[in-house]
Regions:
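Pre-Walker A-like glycine/lysine-rich segment at the N-terminus of P-loop NTPase domains
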Residues: 1-60
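Short acidic, glycine-rich loop/turn motifs
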Residues: 13-15, 86-94, 118-122
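Generic "edge-of-domain/loop-turn" microfeature
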Residues: 18, 29-31, 91-93, 109, ...
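Conserved P-loop NTP-binding catalytic core
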Residues: 52-109
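Electropositive, glycine-dotted interaction segments
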Residues: 105-221
Length: 221
């Protein structure tokens, strides 16, 4: 998927800063020939900066970066966790509809990624159901579901995933976008590997986020 086109169709924010729940739909078309131009406007306190902050968190997650400690400050007051959900279209030899969502909690003033979920479907196959892979850092027995994944990967790769899980938790990084996870998935979960690699490349090369703390003017491209 070296020449893939990635589009963000919509995103949902829960319990982030002053936004208890918000959803923005960027474009109703799943496939577009031209780039979207998105303008966010509204009165002070309406959540414009929160949207930019949410994209910064997304970028850090998909690039496999360590979440900054101040990420915990984005969790809404009196809430334990925040949740971000992004709906993508990936267009290439295979076209996929993808939803990537994750939840972050505050543990002693450090961000803890308690869950990541990847739901995908090949958009050209209308009769096929969606597939979902869920990672949980707070579950000992069902930390990666469906459990058939472990049987597909075998003992050695499952052990490598457990090591990757511990590293991701210690370093406050995404599990799905850990390089070791991609290596474990690539032979048995080809579509998942392609999707994760495509989203990673999109975050690194096409998703630019400048927060208000970096500039007097906030831009989101």
């Amino acid at each position: 998927m070296n020449n893939s086109k990635v589009r963000i169709n919509s995103f949902e924010l829960l319990n982030i800063k002053n936004v208890n729940y918000g959803k923005i739909t960027v474009n109703s078309k799943r496939i577009a020939n031209n780039s979207d131009i998105l303008g966010i406007y509204g009165q002070n306190g309406s959540g414009k900066t929160t949207v930019v902050d949410a994209f910064k968190i997304l970028k850090d997650m998909m690039e496999g970066n360590q979440l900054p400690q101040e990420t915990v400050n984005y969790i809404s007051a009196n809430e334990d966790t925040m949740k971000l959900c992004f709906d993508f279209s990936i267009n290439d030899n295979k076209n996929f509809d993808v939803v990537y969502e994750f939840s972050i909690a505050n543990n002693n003033n450090f961000p803890v990624i308690i869950e990541e979920k990847l739901t995908y479907k090949e958009s050209s196959l209308s009769g096929h159901s969606k597939k979902t892979i869920t990672y949980s850092s707070v579950s000992e027995d069902n930390w990666l579901t469906p459990k058939i994944i472990a049987r597909q990967l075998g003992v050695d790769k499952t052990t490598d995933l457990i090591v990757a899980k511990k590293i991701s938790e210690k370093e406050h990084k995404s599990f799905f976008f850990n390089e070791e996870v991609a290596m474990c998935f690539k032979d048995n979960l080809e579509d998942v590997t392609d999707i994760l690699c495509t989203l990673h490349n999109f975050a690194c090369t096409d998703l630019f986020v400048i927060q208000s703390s970096d500039s007097n003017i906030t831009w989101l491209n």
